Design a protein with these regions (language model features):
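All-alpha RGS (Regulator of G-protein Signaling) helical domain and cognate RGS-like helical scaffolds
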Residues: 2-301
């Protein structure tokens, strides 16, 4: 009798230990709902942007395969992949397969077989506008990522459209509105550095090739005045040292990157976000395809 009780007691103890280990490892014995919680409005926007970025990368990859001599499509594929990564990727509730009775929601990440350069430019433009909208409603900590995606995608859209013989717009360009949208001390100082570098670059050109550069500098001055009138503290240094250029980088390219970074950063910190003003103006500063090519990918993987 004592032996039976001992065996029973040990069996019960073993069962308790096994159940404890199962619970500790996450096994649940209740009828819990395994469905994910509904996505918030902001998460839905993020997911849509990640999906569209992945679709754009897929379209660019296909176009690159059919146009092996073009550098445009591989560049877009790399950029769009960087967007998707920066945005957190395409979320699936069950990435390794849904449990019995459940299915992963559909995602749109594959480009149509007949996607061409015009389709690619269209989707890049859509992505840019939607990223601006997401930035304007996002927490301040997330805005810079959205606005960086928006600006880079817009530059890529203009480049692809030009390659296809068409035209794409940077949007409604207004340096004063951009300055108001990015009115921070840091943005003002960043744009000041860019302005001084551009002045050095223009001075190195033949006299008959300077007008476009001078007009660009004048527009930056207008943006700076708007920043100051909107409350940005003016602590600009009298002289900004020239940057150390990477291999193949030009002073003009470095200046344009500095200005776009400052505008995006300033707009991301605004109390009342107006990302479109900053993005459209920053895009317009890249006046030629050569300059847009020099931007590279503003977001790195």
């Amino acid at each position: 009798m004592t032996s039976r009780r001992l065996v029973f007691g040990l069996s019960a103890l073993l069962a308790v230990l096994i159940i404890g280990l199962l619970i500790a490892s996450g096994v649940r014995f209740d009828n819990q709902d395994v469905d994910p919680a509904p996505a918030s409005s902001q998460e839905s926007k993020r997911q849509a942007l990640a999906e569209k970025s992945t679709l754009i990368a897929d379209a660019a990859k296909r176009l690159a395969a059919s146009s092996p001599n073009s550098s445009v499509f591989p560049r877009v594929e790399s950029a769009a992949s960087a967007y998707a990564s920066a945005l957190g990727g395409v979320w699936r509730p069950w990435p390794n397969g849904a449990p019995s009775g459940r299915t992963n929601p559909p995602v749109s990440t594959s480009a149509p077989a007949n996607a061409d350069a015009s389709f690619l430019a269209l989707k890049l433009g859509e992505l840019s506008r939607e990223a601006v909208a997401a930035a304007n409603s996002a927490p301040a900590s997330q805005r810079q990522t959205y606005l960086s995606v928006a600006l880079d995608a817009r530059l890529q859209a203009v480049g692809v459209a030009t390659h296809a013989g068409g035209k794409a717009s940077c949007g409604d360009v207004d340096p004063v509105a951009a300055g108001k949208a990015a009115a921070t001390e840091e943005a003002l100082s960043g744009v000041e550095a860019a302005r001084q570098w551009l002045e050095t670059d223009v001075a190195s050109l033949p006299a008959n090739q300077r007008q476009a550069g001078i007009s660009r500098i004048d527009s930056i001055k207008a943006a700076q005045s708007a920043m100051i009138s909107s409350g940005a503290k003016d602590r600009r240094p009298a002289v900004v040292a020239l940057p150390k250029l990477a291999a193949g980088e030009t002073l003009r390219g470095a200046a344009l990157k500095r200005s776009s970074s400052a505008l995006v950063s300033g707009a991301a910190k605004a109390d009342k976000p107006n990302g479109e003003a900053a993005v459209s103006y920053a895009c317009s500063l890249y006046a030629t395809q050569e300059e847009r090519d020099s931007a590279g990918t503003l977001l790195k993987k």
